[in-house]
UniProtKB/Swiss-Prot annotation:
Disulfide bonds: none annotated. This is Small ribosomal subunit protein uS17. Belongs to the universal ribosomal protein uS17 family. One of the primary rRNA binding proteins, it binds specifically to the 5'-end of 16S ribosomal RNA. The keyword Ribosomal protein applies. Keywords: Ribonucleoprotein, Ribosomal protein, RNA-binding, rRNA-binding. It comes from Borrelia hermsii (strain HS1 / DAH). It comes from the Bacteria. Gene3D superfamilies: Nucleic acid-binding proteins. The keyword Protease does not apply.
Length: 84
C-alpha cells in the first residue's frame, strides 16, 4: 500500500559538503508543559539532493521518502529562498 500523505518540513541548509546530500536544520517552537514557556527545539536531518542545486544557507522544503542510505530518509522538493 502506497502512503499518500508524506510529511514535509521546512528548514535551513547547514551543510552541503557531501555528494548529493545536504544537512537541513529544522527549528520548531514547543511549549514547556509545566512552565508554559516557548522553547526553540532544533534537529538536523540528512536529505537527498539529486541535482546538487542547494547551497549553504538556503531555505528548503523536504519530504520523507524511503530509506536512501543509513541516515537519509528525506528528499529535497524545492528551494524556497536562496542565501545571500
Amino acid at each position: 500500500m502506497a502512503r499518500e500523505n508524506k510529511k514535509d518540513l521546512i528548514g535551513k541548509v547547514v551543510s552541503d559538503k557531501m555528494s548529493k546530500t545536504i544537512v537541513v536544520e529544522i527549528v520548531q517552537r514547543k511549549m514547556h508543559p509545566i512552565y508554559h514557556k516557548y522553547l526553540k527545539v532544533s534537529r538536523r536531518v540528512k536529505a537527498h539532493d539529486e541535482r546538487e542545486e542547494s547551497r549553504l544557507g538556503d531555505k528548503v522544503r523536504i519530504i520523507e521518502s524511503r530509506p536512501i542510505s543509513k541516515e537519509k530518509r528525506w528528499m529535497l522538493v524545492e528551494i524556497l529562498e536562496r542565501s545571500k
